[in-house]
Amino acid sequence: VPGPSRAPRAARPRGTLTYDKPPLSLDALVGRLSERGLEIPDSERARRYLRHIGYYRLSPYTIPFQQGGPDHVFRDGTSFDDVLDLYVFDRGLRLLVMDALERVEVAMRAALTDHMSTTYGDPHWYVSATHFRRPNTHDGLLRIVRNTCNERLAGSSDAGQDLLVHRSALEHYLTAYGSPELPPSWLMVETLTIGQLTTTYRNLSRRSDRTAVAGAIGLSAPVLESWFQTYVRVRNVCAHHGRLWNLGLGVYPAIPSTTTISWLQGTDALPDRSRRRIYPVLVSLQSILDSVSSRSSWASRLHALLNDRPPMNLSGMGVPEGWADDGFWSRHLT
């Protein structure tokens, strides 16, 4: 369970150097890789990939294949296809993680609005400050929803003249109803990003409400807060197509201390070296899927993605040897 909150870390100072590196052509970039020892049998093919991926997007995927010195020399026998294969693998991992995040995020939205609306018998419960701990944060929520509504009214109709295109539920509410000003809760939650959704949940004033919402997706309130704080970062990386497989996220999911939350079963199933990698994030996503989508094939698809990867890839992710044998995973793989 997460410990007490810490004060925000002070911003690091800016560097003092002047950036004066000139832009390089595709030919020059391919030449640079070749000079560093990367085997490139087809230069035109390499240029084509660099043109459509970008050298500096692909560059981080070269680092695991380098010898480690400041000159960025590649290990003997490393080919352009080795780097490209790692890039494609990471893309597959991002797509798989986004698939799970979508289900988890949708379930969280539904849990929040269902509990609060029915418990208090008010579809506009979120307008009342009595449900929230911090007035400024609540004001921010209302401002977000109000701005979204105003932007929707200022724009053109979703449907226009096309009978096959239906208006969104939010547009229907805004053009059909004049009061209350803001939409009901089940429309409100759809206007929020996952970060705003998490902030709204954390700002609920009653512990009983936070507990009930978390319980609806198989978690305790402190664990939900920790995991969703991590998901905000992970989703941002995925949405911007960033490197995920060996990225240091800076924030990681709390390890549940209760057996009521689905988690790894083996005592050594999550070594210390794995706790600050992407692996516990994958475990946490499957944990929630156990509650909200128990028939999901996500674990099987993850296994298929990881099954044939070299040890370097699994180590970078924090995935321990024999990971799929743990009962947490194996029940989904039989």
Task: Annotate each language-model stretch with its function.
Residues 2-334:
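Long, contiguous internal "core" modules enriched in hydrophobic/ aromatic residues
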